[in-house]
Amino acid sequence: TQAESSAASDVYKRQEIWRTRNQGIGIELKELNLYIYGLVDDVWINTKNDKLIIADYKATSKKGDVTIDAPWQISYKRQIEIYQWLFRQNGFDVDDMSYFVYCNGIKDSKVFDNCLNFEVKILPYKANDSWVTPALKEIKNCLNSDELPEESDRCDYCAYNRKIKLFG
């Protein structure tokens, strides 16, 4: 229909802004005095319900199947959930289903010929952005606190501070 075509055209026009550094898609949270923004790789339209679908592109070169199930890939999932949250905060109707477009470099090609070949896999992920707002409030409380947060073994800054104390 004409309306669907117009919506798709609008999304297409905005894509470049959503991908551009220092623009992207963002929102100012006045009550927290924070500005949150991100640069989204791609936005698709679900033609069955006209909701936006967030797609994120990943590249690697490893043997075996690519997945999004490794413990460290929670950061990928959080990233896409923040993108969904940003679009919803900006008034867009966003599908819970998102996709990772994973490009895995093929290592066992017979010849290079100045060409990299990839196996491309599209991995669906049903995202849940309900944690984002509470996490931002927690972050703001931490920033406003007079006390430092507890150290974590997973924190690079904490590891750096521990090493500095050794020489201190």
Which ranges hold each PLM region?
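A short catalytic or substrate-binding loop motif that flags glycine-/basic-rich loops and adjacent residues
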Residues: 5, 31-37
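Metal-dependent nuclease catalytic regions and adjoining charged, substrate-binding loops involved
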Residues: 85-168
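Short N-terminal edge-element motif at the start of the domain
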Residues: 10, 14-17, 32-34
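Conserved catalytic cores of phosphodiester-cleaving nucleases, focusing on short active-site segments
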Residues: 36-67, 82-83
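Short histidine-centered catalytic/ligand-binding loop motif
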Residues: 62-74, 120-125
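Short Pro/Gly-enriched beta-strand edge/turn motifs at strand-loop
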Residues: 19-28
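Single conserved hydrophobic/aromatic residue that forms the stacking wall/gate
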Residues: 1-8, 12
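An active-site-proximal "capping" alpha-helix that borders the catalytic cofactor pocket
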Residues: 76-87
